[in-house]
Regions:
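Residue-level signal for short, function-critical loop segments
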Residues: 13, 91-94, 153
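Short acidic-aromatic active-site loops that bind/stabilize oxyanions
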Residues: 57-65, 92, 96
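Acyl-thioester C-C bond-transforming condensing/cleaving domain
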Residues: 2, 73-78, 82, 98-100, ...
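Short glycine-rich or small-residue beta-strand-to-loop segments that form or flank ligand, phosphate
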Residues: 86-94, 120
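Condensing-enzyme catalytic core mediating Claisen C-C bond formation in acyl metabolism
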Residues: 1-62, 176-218
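Conserved phosphate-coordination/catalytic loops
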Residues: 62, 66, 126-129
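Short, well-ordered amphipathic alpha-helical segments that serve as non-catalytic structural scaffolds
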Residues: 34-41, 63-79, 102
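Conserved beta-strand elements of the Class I
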Residues: 6, 86-89, 145-148
Length: 218
């Protein structure tokens, strides 16, 4: 097989203005009305300074599908637009709904796109890589000459303070068993919202095209 696959364009989308660490609980809410006892420990270790949330005043500003569409729109110009996409593969662990699938919802929001093969992948941190592998194999095999794949997550609704009432009722475990308390609070200070995508092509497009030699996910 002599066909080649290139990453010809990249795009990303982060919703709303960045949120500093000191402002996080103003967006997510205070569990039990009090600042987190674990937050500073986690932030000191992960070194994250800012993040983006698709939520303001407790209300969503973007759906997961909208995050992905905004990222995909960043791939387009006069030479390549939605009408030219031959395959769409989307990975996420937090779809807006199960049916229709995440990729179907993204495709439905893409203005000007034709009927094309779709793939929705759910596999936590592996979701986007598995979508990338499928898109890569499609172009490599000659089934399509290009493919758009990406990953998006909308986790902020799951990080709201009202989702952590059980943790608040056992907050004394911070002192009695710090490991358990850290484990419960950990993801709240690690995750945020956003989307990224890549255009794969069978021929280079521009000076920044990089060839993918192989992808293997297990």
């Amino acid at each position: 097989m002599n066909r080649k696959v290139y990453t010809s364009r990249l795009s990303s989308f982060l919703p709303n203005a960045p949120v500093d660490n000191d402002e996080m609980e103003n967006i997510l809410g205070y569990v039990g009305g009090h600042p987190s006892r674990i937050k500073k420990i986690i932030l000191r270790q992960n070194q994250i300074k800012q993040r983006h949330y698709a939520m303001r005043e407790g209300n969503l500003t973007h759906t997961n599908a909208e995050l992905m569409v905004n990222a995909i729109n960043g791939l387009f110009d006069n030479e390549f637009d939605a009408n030219a996409i031959e395959l769409l593969a989307c990975g996420t662990s937090t779809p807006d709904q199960l049916i229709p699938s995440h990729a179907s919802m993204v495709h439905g929001l893409l203005k000007g796109s034709n009927p094309i093969p779709l793939l929705s992948v759910s596999g936590v941190c592996c979701s986007a890589v598995q979508a990338l592998e499928f898109a890569f194999l499609s172009v490599l095999s000659g089934h399509t000459s290009n493919a758009v794949c990406g990953g998006s997550e909308l986790v902020s609704p799951l990080l709201r303070s009202d989702m952590f009432e059980e943790e608040y009722r056992t907050i004394n475990q911070v002192q009695e068993n710090p490991y358990i308390a850290f484990e419960k609070d950990f993801l709240r200070w690690m995750l945020s919202d956003g989307a990224g995508c890549v255009l794969l092509t069978d021929k280079p497009m521009g000076k920044m095209s990089l060839e993918i030699k192989w992808i293997e996910s297990v």
